[in-house]
Design a protein with these regions (language model features):
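Conserved acidic donor-binding segment of nucleotide-sugar-dependent glycosyltransferases
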Residues: 341-347, 356-361
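Short hydrophobic "strand-cap" motifs at the C-terminus of beta-strands
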Residues: 171, 234-236, 341
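A charged, aromatic-enriched C-terminal amphipathic alpha-helix characteristic of glycosyltransferases
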Residues: 359-392
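Internal alpha/beta domain cores that form substrate/cofactor-binding pockets in large enzymes
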Residues: 68, 72-140, 145-178, 184-186, ...
């Protein structure tokens, strides 16, 4: 699986590293479903801005993780930045400002009418993006590089980073990739316990870190008291989500569900969800959905198994929605079933409980309010960051 587990006391060089001009943390974020790329393309105002201003404005929109971990780390006294390695327009903007040679830009201006040149361009773009990321790590010389799942890297790249960083961390929240260099990282964090067991069986140091909620969102997005008396499902559907698709299709025949997300084309032709599809929701629009609906339903995907590992649970609970989710291992350590969250074991129970909640909005609101209070108390990114620092043996800087 890779090199042996790093037994160095992680974080020992934190203070001496800072005196050398580097930063403490550099986060390498996933461009989940091209959300950052699409947000950049959709806003011409960003195109003329210098990289730093552009990135700050883009990350402040709460797309995917937004700047939640950056804010939490800086609140703990660390210097922290993040980049999105596969957000091509943003990375190319950084390269322009840093005077990094980028052959993709001038090759893109050449006419390409056949398939082969397109493939060549794609390979070149991948090489250029890898090179830009390496330059960013060299220029920042972070003590910790934290890579998030969904960003493909080779073992040789991670080894190259090590020349300019103290430690490499990985967050993983999707199915395992063949040939991914998991063993090159000092610590892998995951919200799915079964993944942690797989890593530990390979001799890789791994630790449990659940998803979280950015508490700043409720200062910008209203949590409505009078809510839409329907169910919202926000998420993705794909050919690999057969159980989720069949479950939601059947449930939508019993209770009113509005679907936000991607993959509507994979639903059965006669599915009510096709008629109640509301498009995709990112950033503050996503949180507005959670803050507006009475009930939010969740169904795990295969890799999550029976674990309470979905980001959606914390986002919807943080916005005060009454979350209905399948009974999961470890859920009771996060939320109190029946009081802060509603659980089901099968389709029939799910439908029956949702019908009860829709007929008794006061009960649903009471559960949502308790869930929000629990989330703000125990499940913010600040709390997750403190847990991470404990794993690393790092204290906040004075």
């Amino acid at each position: 699986m890779g090199r042996p587990v790093n037994t160095r006391p992680v974080g020992r060089a934190m203070k001496t590293r800072r005196s050398g001009g580097g930063i403490d943390w550099l986060l390498l974020m996933e461009d989940y479903q091209a959300s950052y790329t699409e947000a950049y393309k959709a806003d011409p105002k960003l195109h003329s801005l210098p990289y730093k201003v552009c990135a700050e404005r883009l990350f402040s929109r709460a797309i995917y993780y937004g700047d939640a971990y950056i804010h939490a780390l800086t609140s703990c006294g660390f210097s922290a930045e993040q980049v999105v390695p596969l957000c091509q327009p943003l990375q190319f903007k950084w390269a322009d400002g840093a005077d990094v040679w980028n052959p993709s830009e001038w090759i893109a201006k050449l006419p390409m009418n056949s398939g082969s040149p397109v493939i060549i361009r794609q390979l070149l773009d991948r090489w250029v993006l890898s090179r830009i990321l390496a330059k960013q790590i060299v220029s920042r010389r972070p003590e910790f590089v934290w890579l998030f799942s969904g960003v493909p890297v080779a073992a040789r790249e991670v080894r190259r980073w090590r020349r300019y960083t103290g430690h490499t961390l990985l967050w993983w929240s999707c199915p395992l990739w063949e040939d991914f260099p998991y063993g090159e990282f000092d610590l892998i964090l995951a919200a799915i316990p079964s993944l942690i067991r797989v890593f530990e069986e390979q001799g890789i140091r791994a630790a449990y870190l659940p998803h979280a909620f950015d508490h700043r969102i409720i200062q910008r997005v209203p949590c409505l008291e009078s809510r839409i008396p329907r169910v919202a499902f926000v998420g993705s559907l794909s050919p690999g989500h057969t159980d989720r698709i069949s479950f939601l299709h059947a449930l939508s025949r019993r209770v009113p569900i509005d679907f936000y997300g991607s993959g509507v084309q994979f639903l059965p032709k006669d599915s009510p969800l096709r008629h109640s599809y509301r498009g995709q929701a990112w950033g503050e629009d996503l949180y507005s959905v959670y803050g507006s609906y009475l009930v939010v339903v969740h169904r795990n995907i295969d890799v999550a198994g029976t674990s309470a590992s979905a980001k959606r649970l914390f986002e919807a609970a943080g916005m005060g929605a009454c979350v209905v989710t399948e009974s999961s291992d470890g859920l009771s350590s996060l939320f109190a079933p029946g009081e802060e969250i509603v659980t089901y074991s099968d389709l029939e129970e799910c439908g029956a409980k949702i019908e009860t909640l829709l007929s008794d909005p006061a009960k649903a609101r009471a559960i949502g309010q308790k869930a929000q209070a629990r989330t703000l108390q125990d499940h913010t990114y600040y709390q997750r960051t403190r847990t991470l620092l404990d794993y690393l043996g790092v204290n906040q800087l004075q």
